Amino acid sequence: MSKEDMIELEGVVIEMLPESRFRVRLDNNMEILAYGSGKMKMHRIRVLLGDRVTVEMSPYDLTKGRINFRHPTANPGAGPRPSHHHRR
């Protein structure tokens, strides 16, 4: 399936599940099960409860999706999130 066939929607993470999965409520009030994309894992982009995300879904299964983008937080003074990877 090509990228043009995918449906892209926005939503909010409402629940964090085991194995890097998330329950996301889309803007149309549908709830889906989503996982982080490989690029997000590779660059250690953390997705937390309440984050606004962009989800890519297949038209054949509208209950599952892949999180492609985590939108910046609305609080500009919050600063970057702490990393758990510290060098000694």
UniProtKB/Swiss-Prot annotation:
Keywords: Cytoplasm, Initiation factor, Protein biosynthesis, RNA-binding, rRNA-binding
Annotated spans, Disordered: 66-88
GO molecular function: ribosome binding; rRNA binding; translation initiation factor activity
InterPro entries assigned: NA-bd_OB-fold (IPR012340), RNA-binding_domain_S1_IF1 (IPR006196), S1_domain (IPR003029), TIF_IF1 (IPR004368)
Pfam families: eIF-1a (PF01176)
Subcellular localization, as worded in the UniProt entry: Cytoplasm
Record text on subunit structure and interactions: Component of the 30S ribosomal translation pre-initiation complex which assembles on the 30S ribosome in the order IF-2 and IF-3, IF-1 and N-formylmethionyl-tRNA(fMet); mRNA recruitment can occur at any time during PIC assembly.
Family the entry assigns: Belongs to the IF-1 family.
Protein name per UniProt: Translation initiation factor IF-1 1
Source organism (scientific name): Chromobacterium violaceum (strain ATCC 12472 / DSM 30191 / JCM 1249 / CCUG 213 / NBRC 12614 / NCIMB 9131 / NCTC 9757 / MK)
Upper taxonomic lineage: Bacteria, Pseudomonadati, Pseudomonadota, Betaproteobacteria, Neisseriales
